[in-house]
Design a protein with these regions (language model features):
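Acidic, glycine-anchored loop motifs typical of Ca2+
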Residues: 5-14, 192
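Ser/Thr/Pro-rich, low-complexity mucin-like regions
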Residues: 125-190
Length: 192
C-alpha cells in the first residue's frame, strides 16, 4: 500500500507491505526479484505428449536467488502469457516470495492442492472467511520490516507471492475481481 504523500495522484511515494501470517517465517524470501523473458518468435515448443502441457520451455525466468526455470504453457490457456502491451523483451518484478503451498497429492501430477496460508493474502481463503480474507493497514511494514503507522492508503498493489507451477493447472497466480473498503474498526485478525 502507499500514501499519496506528495499529493500528485501518482503511486510514486514509498510503498509498504502488509505483513501477513508468513512474513516473519524463515522460508519467506524478502527482496525477491524475478525476471521473465519474452518467448522468441522462432521458439520451437517442447510439449509433453498425452498431457495438457504444450510447451515446457515457453517463458524463461531467472530470480535473484540464482534459481531459473520456465513457465510452461498448457492447452487450457491459449492466450499469450507474456504481456503484449510492453515493448521490452523482459519484465522484472520484486517483492516478497512465500514458501510453496501447492502439493501434488496424487504423486503423479493429476491432483494438486494449494493449501491456504493462515491469514493476510489475496485469493487465499474463500471470501466468507472474513477473518482470513481481509487486510488491515496496521500490518504495514517498511522495506526493512519495521512496523509503520498509516492513516490510510491511496494506492493498493496486489501481486502473486509465490513462484510455483502445478503441472497441468499451470503457474500459481493471484486472481482478483474486486476489492472493497470496509473501514473495519474492530478486528479479530491478529497483528504479526
Amino acid at each position: 500500500v502507499a500514501l499519496d504523500r506528495n499529493g500528485n495522484g501518482l503511486p510514486d511515494d514509498e510503498w509498504y507491505e502488509l505483513a501477513g501470517s508468513e512474513y516473519h517465517k524463515p522460508e519467506t524470501a524478502h527482496n525477491y526479484t524475478i525476471t521473465y523473458y519474452r518467448t522468441p518468435a522462432d521458439h520451437v515448443a517442447t510439449p509433453i505428449p498425452q498431457t495438457p502441457i504444450t510447451d515446457t520451455s515457453y517463458i524463461a525466468w531467472i530470480a535473484n536467488d540464482g534459481s531459473t526455470g520456465y513457465i510452461e504453457k498448457n492447452s487450457y490457456h491459449r492466450q499469450e502469457y507474456f504481456p503484449q502491451w510492453i515493448d521490452s523483451d523482459e519484465i522484472t518484478f520484486s517483492g516478497t516470495r512465500l514458501a510453496h503451498n501447492a502439493i501434488d497429492e496424487s504423486g503423479i501430477g493429476s491432483y494438486y492442492v494449494l493449501y491456504a496460508y493462515d491469514w493476510g493474502y489475496a485469493d487465499n481463503h474463500p471470501n466468507e472467511v472474513e477473518d482470513k480474507s481481509c487486510f488491515n493497514i496496521d500490518w504495514a511494514v517498511d522495506q526493512d520490516g519495521n512496523p509503520v503507522h498509516l492513516d490510510g492508503a491511496d494506492f493498493i498493489r496486489v501481486f502473486t507471492g509465490v513462484n510455483q507451477s502445478c503441472g497441468w493447472l499451470g503457474e500459481t497466480s493471484t486472481e482478483l475481481c474486486r476489492a472493497e473498503d470496509l473501514h473495519i474498526e474492530l478486528s479479530t485478525i491478529p497483528n504479526p
